[in-house]
Regions:
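Conserved substrate/cofactor phosphate-moiety recognition/catalytic segment
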Residues: 8-46
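Conserved GTP-binding G-domain of TRAFAC-class P-loop NTPases and closely related GTPase folds
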Residues: 74-110
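Residues that form or flank phosphate/diphosphate-binding pockets in enzymes
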Residues: 12, 57, 96
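Walker A (P-loop) ATP-phosphate-binding motif of ABC ATPase nucleotide-binding domains
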Residues: 2
């Protein structure tokens, strides 16, 4: 399973990605090295990919199963073609935000 957390610079991708990977028992990969991602997925692991994606070609190349779009800055990027969770504002509590993401993610997988 490949979970992509994408957004503009300083949108909070890493702030969410690291604790999310820990809560899901997933591997955290910053910037999406394709060979590493393929290896982890082949082993049956869930991978959290933390990547700045200014355009949809980058997203399509990663071929994620689940997309979290961090749309929290004034910088505009292409809207991802398929978004499972759209985060529109900064969060007061990272733990609460990650818990909400995990809950919605698990609901979508069942």
């Amino acid at each position: 399973m490949k979970i992509l957390i994408c957004g503009a610079k300083d949108s909070g991708k890493t702030t969410i990605a690291k604790p999310l990977a820990k809560q899901l028992g997933a591997e955290y990969i910053r910037c999406g090295k394709l060979y590493t991602i393929k290896d982890f997925v082949a082993e049956g692991k869930t991978v959290i990919i933390d990547k700045r994606c200014e355009n949809n070609r980058k997203i399509e190349k990663l071929d994620p199963d689940y997309v979290i779009w961090m749309d929290t800055t004034e910088q505009r990027i292409d809207t991802p073609p398929k978004v499972h969770q759209h985060i529109k504002k900064r969060f007061d509590s990272v733990d609460q935000q990650v818990s909400a993401i995990v809950k919605k993610y698990r609901r979508s997988c069942s």
